Design a protein with these regions (language model features):
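Hydrophobic alpha-helical segments
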Residues: 1-174
Length: 174
């Protein structure tokens, strides 16, 4: 894990407090971690789609990629954003669950398609029935960015921080 340049360390602490292991691993490339930080900040705080919906998209991607790190980190954020325990519990079967409305199901179908690498005309059409093009683009970027995050975590062998290891439900139960 890298140590940060002073300016980057200050910025990371402003945004996230103690930088998580993902940022410490990315810190081996200061220019990329700086760009990544600002882009992820924009996705988290400067978007129009509801945070709750974006967190559902992120959690579903984490399930599909079996990314324990991403799942554990975003469970806290999802709960804080208003995702219900029932939705978390039924996320792996969202398409047949009554816990999700039509808009959420359209976003989750899009999240799955983006994460798995192919958005069909049907998935796109259903998403565009619920979202205008601005929000559709946002959701596509969120799903794609967090799919990249999951893949980077795996490729770099980033371990979940000890204080984040006690979470429920476990990804393995999903």
């Amino acid at each position: 894990m890298a140590e940060f340049e002073p300016a980057l360390k200050k910025r990371l602490e402003e945004l996230w407090g103690t930088p998580p292991n993902l940022y410490r691993a990315l810190g081996n490339h200061p220019k990329l971690v700086a760009a990544w930080t600002e882009f992820s900040k924009t996705l988290r705080y400067d978007t129009r789609t509801p945070r709750e919906l974006r967190e559902l998209v992120i959690l579903r991607g984490a399930q599909l990629m079996r990314s324990e790190y991403e799942w554990a980190q975003h469970l806290k954020m999802a709960r804080k954003a208003g995702v219900s325990e029932a939705q978390i519990g039924e996320l792996s079967s969202w398409n047949s669950s009554r816990e999700f409305n039509g808009k959420e199901k359209a976003a989750l179908a899009l999240a799955e398609a983006v994460t798995l690498g192919k958005v069909s005309d049907e998935v796109q059409a259903e998403a565009l029935r619920h979202f205008d093009m601005h929000d559709y683009v946002e959701l596509c970027i969120v799903a794609a960015f967090y799919a990249m995050v999951g893949r980077m975590l795996d490729a770099m062998g980033v371990q979940l921080e000890p204080e984040a290891r006690e979470y429920s439900p476990r990804l393995s139960s999903q």
